[in-house]
Amino acid sequence: MLGVGAGYLEAEFRAVGASFAQRGAVTDEYLGAMQTLWYDEHPEYHGRFADFAGVDGRPRPLQRPIPLVVAGHSAPAYRRAVAWAHGWYGYWLTADNVAASLTGLRAAADRVDRPAALGELEISVTPRGPVTPGQAAAFAEAGVHRLVFLAPQTPDGPAQTIDAAITTVAGL
């Protein structure tokens, strides 16, 4: 699985001399260029931000296709997820506010042709804080396929997060 996001912190772009304003266009083009490198026997790509021919990207990924997941809470991110990805990832959401993102994804699906090979768009969310069994059920009812729990950055954080997830799932 490969997670892709265009970024949202302008200072990070300044730090590496990249254009914040063009981040979406660059991301879209790089997705096309990467797929050419991964899947084409003789990869060639000519775009505004990536331009190559006579190269080969090896080793190639064993899993074909690579499951792409696009992150973001904007109309361009929703469009990118529908057009390119197997899944969409939302960060720090509640069961209540995930609905706005799902509405945005449906609107993008009405405007963008989704390749049939991608199948149904899988929805993954990192919830805001601990989740009760009732909240997990509400996420599922809203259309979320997967919850990704964020462990606190403490020595016991991962174990506590796993224990909480087990308790949540056991309560469903």
Task: Pin down the residues of each PLM region.
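Active-site-adjacent structural elements that line small-molecule/cofactor binding pockets in enzymes
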Residues: 1-172
